[in-house]
């Protein structure tokens, strides 16, 4: 492992958490050899300076605070950040996030008059928005009326 590769990775981590996949991609862009990348990642993980588990927990909290649901966050972690499904599931089980409360906050912010929107067209719009932001129907269906998901598709 070269000190240049290690310094580059430490510099990245000094600004924010990165997943192993993200560091690997950034180091490949800088044309470090695979051996340098492997050695650097091993040393970072040995010193506990890089941890996919810690990254996942922080990312989960940050995205939930920004108004995204479980499905969206899981997809981002797996596809964009290269986190293993087991790590994502473990972090979700350990977190104490009230997804229904987040769904209600998102609903109230995006659709302040959602209680008055009782026609089918407006309910469909709300359903599409909430589902596209990664919320399960159970997290928000009670807030927008007695309809079921099947009625809106």
Swiss-Prot record:
InterPro entries, sorted:
RecX_HTH_1st (IPR053926), RecX_HTH_2nd (IPR053924), RecX_HTH_3rd (IPR053925), Regulatory_RecX (IPR003783), WH-like_DNA-bd_sf (IPR036388)
Chief subcellular location = cytoplasm
Per the record, the domain of life is: Bacteria
Q: What does this protein do?
A: Modulates RecA activity.
Keyword field: Cytoplasm
Q: Which Pfam families match?
A: RecX_HTH1 (PF21982), RecX_HTH2 (PF02631), RecX_HTH3 (PF21981)
Q: Where in the cell is it found?
A: Cytoplasm
Q: Does the keyword NADP apply?
A: no
Name of the featured protein: Regulatory protein RecX
Which is one Gene Ontology cellular component term of this protein?
cytoplasm
**GO BP field:** regulation of DNA repair
Family from the record: Belongs to the RecX family.
């Amino acid at each position: 492992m070269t000190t240049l590769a290690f310094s580059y990775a430490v510099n990245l981590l000094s600004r924010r958490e990165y997943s192993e996949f993200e560091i690997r991609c950034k180091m490949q862009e800088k044309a470090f050899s695979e051996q340098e990348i492997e050695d650097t990642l091993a040393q970072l993980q040995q010193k506990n300076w890089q941890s996919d588990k810690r990254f996942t927990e922080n990312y989960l909290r940050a995205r939930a605070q920004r108004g995204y649901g479980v499905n969206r966050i899981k997809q981002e972690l797996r596809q964009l950040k290269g986190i293993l499904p087991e790590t994502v599931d473990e972090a979700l089980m350990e977190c104490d996030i009230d997804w229904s409360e987040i769904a209600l906050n998102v609903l109230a912010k995006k659709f302040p008059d959602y209680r008055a929107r009782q026609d089918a067209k407006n309910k469909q719009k709300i359903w599409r928005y909430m589902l596209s932001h990664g919320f399960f129907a159970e997290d928000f269906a009670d807030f927008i009326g007695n309809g079921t998901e099947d009625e809106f598709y």
